[in-house]
């Protein structure tokens, strides 16, 4: 809800999809800088307290934008500043939230829990844009920010009532070194020694760059192609989240697709995005967005499960702190790319190009994973 309201406000203030792309980038680029440090924080401090702190900051940012916009603020750089602050907060919140899921259910229930957690997140992503679209259309962005601040307080209360004594605290006897530099490098060293894990994380980054550009292209489709305004923008986000909800629930039921399934879902994600760009009517476009959302969460849930299951307990936060910057940092760069393509060549062309690049990335990573598997088989045969 917060990000949709921010993106729509930037489009209102500037009239530029490229400016929306910059807003998206500013939300996610801080993760490239803060990510490795946030992983150390997540591994060393109680996740519940970290989540409460992050949620408090996010609620304050929403409340601040609500007051500023209600008072008639028009300086887009204030929104950009909020995007940066939210990006820093999210770079800590993301790894902490994922590891906290592990603490709630333990390793045995992790695959299903990741899928269910993604499903619940997508339910929020489905209701949030729909609610934001209605609120913005009826009362403006300030009301949407204020509503989100209130929801943030409710989430903070929910986290606070979780009992720490009931959590599963994993311990790894081969944990990372205790010196600060070693703690930061532990995640890098762990991932670099596991090329298949590295390739899955790289694929997430490439799909983030080429596929997860919804805030830019969906705003442009609503504004320039279908002329449906904020209500249409909210609808497009809602149906994408509906498909994502189904994808997350199915991924939770399957539990683990395996590397072939991860690569296949990534390739289909790019293909469905490309096809959505070619739809001649808004009704068909909306229908394709459901499929795009479905493939998005099939890939993301399966990739996140694979990364967490392969990471040792003592470095899980640090590994996720590398995974999220790759995924969301790619998202930031992809927002700039999609904004530039939309500005200069049109939003349909932008979606075709990024969809094709996402599909090509999946095929290349799939080939590299096949080569690694073949090499291992030959080594064992010797």
Which residue stretches match the model-derived regions?
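Alpha-helical transmembrane-bundle signature of multi-pass membrane transport and export proteins
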Residues: 1-382
């Amino acid at each position: 809800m917060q990000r949709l309201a921010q993106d729509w406000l930037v489009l209102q203030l500037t009239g530029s999809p490229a400016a929306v792309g910059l807003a998206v980038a500013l939300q996610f680029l801080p993760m490239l800088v803060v990510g490795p440090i946030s992983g150390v924080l997540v591994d060393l401090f109680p996740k519940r307290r970290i989540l409460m702190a992050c949620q408090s900051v996010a609620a304050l940012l929403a409340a601040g934008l609500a007051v500023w916009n209600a008072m008639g603020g028009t300086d887009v750089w204030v929104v950009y500043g909020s995007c940066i602050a939210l990006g820093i907060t999210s770079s800590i919140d993301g790894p902490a939230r994922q590891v906290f899921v592990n603490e709630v259910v333990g390793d045995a229930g992790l695959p299903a829990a990741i899928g269910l957690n993604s499903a619940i997140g997508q339910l929020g992503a489905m209701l949030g844009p729909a609610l934001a679209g209605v609120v913005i259309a009826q009362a403006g962005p300030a009301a949407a920010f204020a509503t989100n601040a209130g929801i943030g307080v409710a989430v903070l209360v929910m986290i606070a009532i979780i009992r720490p004594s009931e959590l599963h605290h994993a311990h790894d006897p081969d944990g990372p070194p205790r010196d600060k530099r070693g703690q930061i490098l532990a995640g890098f060293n762990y991932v670099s020694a596991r090329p298949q894990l590295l390739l899955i994380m790289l694929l997430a980054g490439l799909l983030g760059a080429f596929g997860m550009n919804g805030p830019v292209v969906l705003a442009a489709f609503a504004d320039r192609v279908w002329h449906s305004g904020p209500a249409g923008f909210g609808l497009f986000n809602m149906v994408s989240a509906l498909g994502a909800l189904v994808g997350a629930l199915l991924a939770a039921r399957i539990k683990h697709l395996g590397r072939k399934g991860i690569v296949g879902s990534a390739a289909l994600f790019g293909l469905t995005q490309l096809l959505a760009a070619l739809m001649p009517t808004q009704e068909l476009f909306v229908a394709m967005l459901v499929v795009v959302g479905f493939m998005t969460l099939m890939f993301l849930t399966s990739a996140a499960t694979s990364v967490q299951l392969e990471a040792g307990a003592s470095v899980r936060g640090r590994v996720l702190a590398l995974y999220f910057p790759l995924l969301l940092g790619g998202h930031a760069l992809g927002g700039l790319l999609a904004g530039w393509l939309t500005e200069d060549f049109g939003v349909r062309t932008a979606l075709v190009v990024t969809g094709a690049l996402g599909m090509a990335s999946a095929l290349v990573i799939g080939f590299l994973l096949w080569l690694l598997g073949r090499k291992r088989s030959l080594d064992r045969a010797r």
